Amino acid sequence: MYEVLQYIDGKLTPGTPGRSQDINDPARGEMIGRVRLASREDVDAAVAAAQRAFPGWAATPPLRRSRILNRFRALLEEHAEELAATITSEHGKVHADALGEVQRGLEVVEFAVGIPHLLKGEVTENVGTSVDSHSLRQPLGVVAGITPFNFPI
């Protein structure tokens, strides 16, 4: 049996005691692990860590960001079989479908690698008499998203 911890401020943490949920293998009907659930304090700690990291990430050049995402993509690819096996045991998907989910996750990361190119500002000359338009894209701060957990990976 394994335990899924929270990753906050660069380290794995068990979070608030007593808040967890079983992970069950639907094919065998048995518990295979536990996932720690976040409390309000855990979320506050994660947001505070992200706010502390924000200035450094905002100053990171787009090429460096792409390299970091490429490394993440390489790790997903390297561990594709292991990830697919986890999806199969936790969700009951057949292995081929689970591998497809990992592949779709890889495609999303590959798309994200190219996003820094879209972060460039624009200059449009003569939008009006003696008027030029300049746009500059800058990170604004920490955001959070509550997203579907089940696809892709």
Predicted regions and their residues:
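Hydrophobic face of amphipathic alpha-helices that form TPR/SEL1-like repeat modules
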Residues: 1-28
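Short glycine-rich loop/turn motifs that provide flexible caps or phosphate-binding loops at active sites
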Residues: 9, 17, 32, 91, ...
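Residue-level signature of catalytic and energy-coupling elements of molecular machines
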Residues: 10, 29, 65, 109, ...
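Secondary-structure boundary/capping motif
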Residues: 15, 97, 152-153
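A short local loop/turn or secondary-structure capping micro-motif enriched for an aromatic residue
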Residues: 22-23, 40-43, 153
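Conserved strand-loop elements at the edges of beta-sheets that form or border functional pockets
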Residues: 25, 37, 137
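Glycine-rich loop-to-alpha-helix module at the N-terminal edge of alpha/beta enzyme cores
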Residues: 32-119, 130
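Conserved small-residue-rich beta-alpha loop and adjacent elements
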Residues: 122-153
